[in-house]
Amino acid sequence: MGVVGALSEVTSASEDALRLLISVLAGYPLAVVHRTFFYNKPAQHQHLFFVIVGLSLWMFNCGSSVIHPILSIFGAFFITNFMAGTDASIYAAHIVFLGHLLIGYWFHETDTYDITWTTPFCIMTLRFIGLVMDVYDGAQKPEHLKPDQKLTAISDKPGLLEIAAFGLFFQGTLVGPQFTLSKFRSFVNGDWLDSDGQPPKSAFLPSIGRFLAGCTYMVLHQWGQFWIPDQYFNSDAYNNLSFFWRWSWVTLWFRLTMYKYCAMWLITEGASILSGLGHNGKDAEGNDRWDGVRDLHIIKWETGHDYNSVVESFNCGTNTFAKNHIHRRLRWVNNKLASHVITLSYLAIWHGYHLGYFLLFGVELGCVQAQNQLYALIKRTPGWSEAISKPISRPFIWIFGKLTISYSMGFAFLMFGLIKTKYWIGPVKSLYFIGFIIYFIVWPILHMVLLRVLPRHPKKAAAEKPEEVKKEL
């Protein structure tokens, strides 16, 4: 029995999970090595260091399955160097990377969340698809690009070593964060260094802060796993509870389960800050900003009271990819709802084949649509905006919003967190399919009624016609 196996027995954690955690924690000493010995070396030397370390981490976690990222690196090189700027390159990227991932899901799909080579490969999939799209943008005329595309467009094709380093960078190859090649190049070129060309010491405190926050979330998640195990929702003890308490326990379990993602992102971000990748320029006062690869905005995630706050605070890297590389490129559809549906379907497919993934994103779509319709009603109804803007109203609005998104997301996450239909169908039935009923039956009907019965601001008087103005003059 190896060291990891012994630790697995002592901690009751799976060996695969321990290997992943050790690899993520290794990002801190590796960051120290980079900022001590490699930060001012030529790009090729840094790339070689990243490739060697990244392959080692993959082998430590996945063994011979390291062949999968290697094949994808060669695929990315071929597409970006021999198909750059063509529509075919976008199709090829999805066939080569997303297709590769989906085949992996097909052969490794089980009833639980298993950590296999597909776990880190899903990160590489989006990174390389984004790379191909950025190279595609770089081949277009600048005047045809949107502002966000100009920031990430790559006009000079990356070489094989740079692509390998980009995909295998030790602080992003296993659990994220997502970042673009332009961001990676800025880091390798030393744009994050201080005026003396040295790694800024201002990275230390933010790095430690994110690490400690990640550890806190990890402890809370582990405590939650023992307190509310997944099996509880198919037990007699759960089914004998009242409807309110069944839904409340689901909501609490959802929050505690999400903390494992929060923990890994925060710990990884801390290491990214220490290495310099997290540098994001300077603020208005000239201080270094270290939120360049932020995946979790803690305060907004914990205190936000609408669905916008969730999207803006949680899994920011993937959400940014979806916004810039999928949603905004669907402008030709000329329909915001259709673009939203396509984007969420894309993310569901990226997660895998389980029905629950698609239902989760479906409920999310219903929630966001209901929120947008409610906001539109508030804006058009006289006195409503004024009433909720009063200080005395704010606490009640926050409580209502926080409970609404927490309970709605808790219901939806049942179908994601319990994975297999045979595990989540019982708990969903016990909640009487409440999320689907509210957002796809009750609210649409109520919205149509409110549109007809609520008063609205009077339309502004039409501007006088030029001819009429002349007559009056």
Curated annotation (Swiss-Prot):
One of its GO terms (molecular function) is lysophospholipid acyltransferase activity. It comes from the Eukaryota. The keyword Zinc-finger does not apply. Pathway: Lipid metabolism; phospholipid metabolism. Belongs to the membrane-bound acyltransferase family. It catalyses: a 1-acyl-sn-glycero-3-phosphocholine + an acyl-CoA = a 1,2-diacyl-sn-glycero-3-phosphocholine + CoA; a 1-acyl-sn-glycero-3-phospho-L-serine + an acyl-CoA = a 1,2-diacyl-sn-glycero-3-phospho-L-serine + CoA; a 1-acyl-sn-glycero-3-phosphoethanolamine + an acyl-CoA = a 1,2-diacyl-sn-glycero-3-phosphoethanolamine + CoA. One of its GO terms (biological process) is nematode larval development. Its main location: endoplasmic reticulum. This is Lysophospholipid acyltransferase 5. It is found in: Endoplasmic reticulum membrane. The keyword Disulfide bond does not apply. It holds the Pfam family MBOAT. Probable acyltransferase which may mediate the conversion of lysophosphatidylcholine (1-acyl-sn-glycero-3-phosphocholine or LPC) into phosphatidylcholine (1,2-diacyl-sn-glycero-3-phosphocholine or PC) (LPCAT activity). The di-lysine motif may confer endoplasmic reticulum localization. The chain crosses the membrane at residues 20-40, 43-63, 66-86, 88-108, 341-361, 396-416, 431-451. GO terms for cellular component: endoplasmic reticulum; endoplasmic reticulum membrane; membrane. Keywords: Acyltransferase, Endoplasmic reticulum, Lipid biosynthesis, Lipid metabolism, Membrane, Phospholipid biosynthesis, Phospholipid metabolism, Transferase, Transmembrane, Transmembrane helix. A motif (Di-lysine motif) lies at residues 470-473.
